[in-house]
Amino acid sequence: MTIAKIRCRLFIMKDKIIDAAIRRVPDFPKKGILFYDITGILVNPEVFSYCLDKMTEMYKDKKVDAVAAIEARGFIFAAPFAYKMGIPLILIRKKGKLPGETYSASYDLEYGQASVEVHKTDVVKGQKVLLLDDLIATGGTLNAARSILEEGGAKVVGFCGVVGLPFLNYSKVLGDLPVKTLIEYDSEKI
């Protein structure tokens, strides 16, 4: 086994605090999908705080001007993260939820299709933006969010998630930008 594979296996070893809070729900939202439910983190203030502290530690020395969050669960982690980092929060919403002029993009999900949009006024040209979501699966949502931010002139500098599912190959979709997660799972098996 190579050093890279050993490091990968060690990284995929679960953070026990976070792992204990994540519930696995088989066949949701459709048959054959194992859903990693992060609500156990939210009902436990100590685990939620632990996650925010880990995220802040990962990015405290990085050049990030703003964080953009994916609706809806990404908002939950991004708002306190933005506050702790002292940076603005940009909301990436589902299509049809924003009243002003928007940038919009469609994408494929692990289990369907959707569109996201952002207010044009919220995107600042040249701003270095970190994209944050609760879970990174195929990377489709984050890639669509990146495209609308870049359309407005922002520079996406990385992706962050609470949970990562690298076996769904999100790195191929997200390209060469850094992807950081607090915990990763290597399959959809219980």
UniProtKB/Swiss-Prot annotation:
Organism from which the protein derives: Treponema denticola (strain ATCC 35405 / DSM 14222 / CIP 103919 / JCM 8153 / KCTC 15104)
Lineage, top ranks: Bacteria, Pseudomonadati, Spirochaetota, Spirochaetia, Spirochaetales
Family: Belongs to the purine/pyrimidine phosphoribosyltransferase family.
InterPro entries the UniProt entry points to: Ade_phspho_trans, Adenine_PRTase, PRibTrfase_dom, PRTase-like
UniProt pathway annotation: Purine metabolism; AMP biosynthesis via salvage pathway; AMP from adenine: step 1/1
Locations listed in the record: Cytoplasm
GO CC terms, sorted: cytoplasm
Name of the protein described by the UniProt record: Adenine phosphoribosyltransferase
GO molecular function: adenine phosphoribosyltransferase activity
Keyword Ligase among UniProt keywords: no
